[in-house]
A protein has these predicted regions:
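Helix-terminus loop motifs that line ligand-binding clefts
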Residues: 105-135, 141-213, 219, 226-231, ...
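Conserved functional hotspot residues or short segments at active or partner-binding sites
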Residues: 236
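Single conserved hydrophobic/aromatic residue that forms the stacking wall/gate
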Residues: 253-264
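Active-site rim elements
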Residues: 86, 198-201, 265
Length: 265
């Protein structure tokens, strides 16, 4: 499947099509035709080669026993909930999480949202948006430590798409330089607090800097100086400017004005 969405890091806020790209009917049709011409066996080989090139980079051994490994997973889960030790199940969950991220967050696509990319409803919980107050960050905490930096690329693009609208938020709400965002986000550059919700939980000015730290983490693991020079540094510098302006001098120290991160408060 495809959509007409395109990432735009310099959006024109007067243009209703500033986030419109390809015709999804054309691209989807071409993909379906190409897939049908290859046949199932070839597609399975391509799929296996694609995900194993990432999945096979990391192994985890917690010395699980074979008897537990031979049990059906639902039974293992029930036993685990009852207090049984099953290190092998923990290994399985570790790799299951990596597989889900590999399958839901690849270059050129949108990042994993509150439901990954899967849910069983047309309108999923919380509209399956991006909650910037910990949820979207949690999706990506394991990515670089488990050697999946490529899977972070859609998240980086999501953050980059917040910078220009986030500059407006910084000026309008906080009289600050740089950029920031708030608790809820979407791929269309939505960075302001929700105007129909209470500011007691909705105003999260340090969300932008929190998101920006992921760009530094990506560089810290990859040591990709081209990324830092061409992408990461400008985003980080702008975020740092907002953070500096958000501080208040109190005697000999600087403090942050009150903020809220609802999911971890």
């Amino acid at each position: 499947a495809d959509t007409d969405y395109k990432a735009n890091f310099s959006p024109d806020f007067t243009d209703p099509k500033t986030y419109v790209g390809v015709n999804p009917l054309e691209t989807t049709g071409k993909w379906v035709e190409a897939a049908a011409s290859k046949g199932y066996a070839a597609l399975l080989r391509e799929h296996t080669a694609d995900y194993t090139s990432l999945f096979g980079r990391v192994s985890l051994s917690l010395a699980g026993d074979q008897a537990s490994a031979d049990l059906p997973t639902p039974e293992r889960l029930e036993r685990y909930r009852s207090g049984a030790s099953d290190p092998g199940l923990e290994e399985l969950y570790f790799q299951f999480g990596r597989y889900l991220l590999i399958a839901s967050s690849r270059g050129g696509n949108l990042p994993a949202n509150l439901q990954g990319i899967w849910h069983n409803n047309v309108d999923g919980p919380w509209r399956v948006d991006y909650h910037n107050n910990i949820n979207v960050q949690m999706n990506y905490w394991p990515a670089c430590p488990t050697n999946l930096p490529e899977c972070v690329e859609p998240f980086i693009d999501y953050v980059r798409a917040l910078v220009k609208p986030g500059e407006r938020v910084a000026r309008s709400y906080y009289n600050a330089r740089g950029w920031t965002a708030s608790i809820s986000g979407n791929p269309f550059g939505f960075a302001s607090p929700l105007n129909d919700e209470s500011m007691t939980w909705n105003l999260c000015p340090m969300v932008g800097p929190w998101l920006a730290t992921h760009l530094w983490d990506y560089y810290d693991y990859t040591r990709d100086t081209t990324f830092l020079r061409e992408v990461g540094y400008d985003v980080l510098r702008s975020s740092a400017r907002f953070t500096v302006d958000h501080l208040w001098k109190l005697s000999l120290i600087h403090i942050s004005e009150p903020t809220r991160q609802e999911a971890i408060s």
